[in-house]
Amino acid sequence: MDGVIVIRKEKGFTSHDVVAKLRGILHMKKIGHTGTLDPDAEGVLPVALGKATRLVDMITDKEKTYEAVMRLGVVTDTQDMSGTVLSQTTELSVTEEELCTVVSSFVGDYMQVPPMYSALKVNGKKLYELAREGKTVERKPRPVHFYEIEILDISFPLVRFRVTCSKGTYIRTLCHDIGEKLGCGAAMESLLRTKVGRFTLDDAITLAQTEEAVQEGTIESKILGIEEILAEYPRVCCTKEGDRLLANGNPLVQALVDAQEKNGWI
């Protein structure tokens, strides 16, 4: 099986847990997920199968959409409600107008400092491993982009919003930074990823549904083929020499592009 299966990751599973379970369900080893979701987060997790694992970087590079709930008035060490509370207040002086102004100020390019509780590595060691040892290290801000942030509901201290952003963005850090700018602190209460590139919740199935499809013999219908995944990209024909170079992992140069489809295509 070569293609992508879109899994609806449930709470309590890491992205690596999903891959491990799929290897058992599908009886195949060549599987890779296309973007980490925290254990407490849920939603769209495209998983590449077989030859489609070569496309992981292309899929991961796509913009992502989330629905999140943040709790104002609390700061935790993990920037979400699973962590240890560092400070808390029940007296919020934030108005809806102030909230909307601060939230909208994050739209566009932003230099985001990754959280200590993350899988990023420093000197070969993951940040969350250092954090669990009680260590804090300097993290360099990374450029991210927020295409849109829409507030869906305000029920202080809870605020529900939808955000579309670039890859590598931490939504719990966004919540933390919003709280910091408001002066009251904030932490992420829940997170649902609703879209990764072209893949949406409507495309997603749970691990249990995947196992059921295998048992019923309908699993092939749940997998998007490589050609379908690449349909959004321009189709370029190349010469036989170009075919040979591509097959060996070499880049294609303009001189090896041919308008005649009979010689192959990529």
Model-derived segments and spans:
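Accessory RNA 3′-end/elbow-binding domains used by RNA modification enzymes
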Residues: 1-10, 14-37, 41-44, 59-62, ...
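The conserved catalytic core of RNA pseudouridine synthases
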Residues: 24-28, 42, 46, 137-168, ...
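Residue-level signal for inorganic ion chemistry
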Residues: 47, 68, 124, 174, ...
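Short, charged/polar surface micro-motifs in flexible loops or helix N-caps
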Residues: 50-53, 75
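Structural signature of FAD isoalloxazine-binding scaffolds in flavoprotein oxidoreductases
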Residues: 57-72, 137-151
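Acidic, low-complexity central loop/insert segments
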Residues: 58-111
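Short, structured patches in soluble enzyme cores that scaffold and shape functional sites
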Residues: 70-72, 132, 150-153, 163-167, ...
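Extended alpha-helical targeting/anchoring segments
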Residues: 118, 122-148
